[in-house]
Amino acid sequence: MIELEFNDVAANTSSTFDPEIAYVNFKRIHTTGLSYDHIRVLYIKGREIKTSLTKRSEWEVTLNLGGWKVAVFNTNFPGNRNSPVPDDGLTLHRLSGFLARYLLEKILKVSDPEKLIIKSKIINPLAEKNGITWADGEEVYLSFFPGSEMFLGTFKFYPLAIGIYKVQKKEMEPKYLEKTMRQRYMGLEAATWTVSKVNEVQAALTVVSGLGWKKTNVSAAAREFLAKFGINM
């Protein structure tokens, strides 16, 4: 006869994960040999990667992104979603956010020719499908990447503003703001910054609301090609 065992497991009421510490560790361990081409693969194949992970039950999976290999904990598989991830562990979501910050740091300090290389290689499908491009601002464009909400200070509240805008326009359910609303801002807990930083959030929302939002199925590469013929989409 089969035996089914059940135990009462105490709920994890607080998280010890600190994105700032985790990001420093990520840069120290994983960025040697990392190229813009590797990062490009993660983002343009993001949906495909996520879909693949949801179909695999393995808890630890190594992603090979154009030759750059990185191990992630597979929280995308439904049966793994409640499994605790080590504070120094990577998930697809964390990896996306870390690389978004890594790119912003690069853009803010490299030469203009290298900036052009970054912007030519890195495409943000979630921004592009809404008609948002690099021309709308580097912090804004990178804030459309999943995981950027871990760094509300670095990205000037734009990840939150994007979420608020989508909820206001009925494009997203309010429940998807929960993760962002738990984040720190420049060391401040959410209970503090939600009171003291309302003006900053409103300023970010004003910028986001003023973007040329428009749904499009035309890729960034296709738009660039058509622009050569005077066609702007």
Curated annotation (Swiss-Prot):
Species this chain originates from: Maguari virus
Subunit annotation: Homotetramer. Binds the viral genomic RNA.
Coiled-coil stretches noted in the UniProt entry, renumbered to this chain: none
Residues binding RNA: 14-15, 18, 47, 50, 75, 81, 94, 123, 125, 128, 166, 176, 182-184, 217
Function: Encapsidates the genome protecting it from nucleases. The encapsidated genomic RNA is termed the nucleocapsid (NC) and serves as template for transcription and replication. The NC have a helical organization.
Keywords (A to Z) from UniProt: Capsid protein, Helical capsid protein, Ribonucleoprotein, RNA-binding, Viral nucleoprotein, Virion
Keyword Transferase: no
Main location: virion
GO CC list: helical viral capsid; ribonucleoprotein complex; viral nucleocapsid
Domain statement: The N-terminus and C-terminus are involved in homooligomerization and play an essential role in viral RNA synthesis.
Disulfide bond positions: none
UniProt name for this protein: Nucleoprotein
This protein's record includes keyword Ribosomal protein: no
GO molecular function, one term: RNA binding
Compartmental location: Virion
Family per record: Belongs to the orthobunyavirus nucleocapsid protein family.
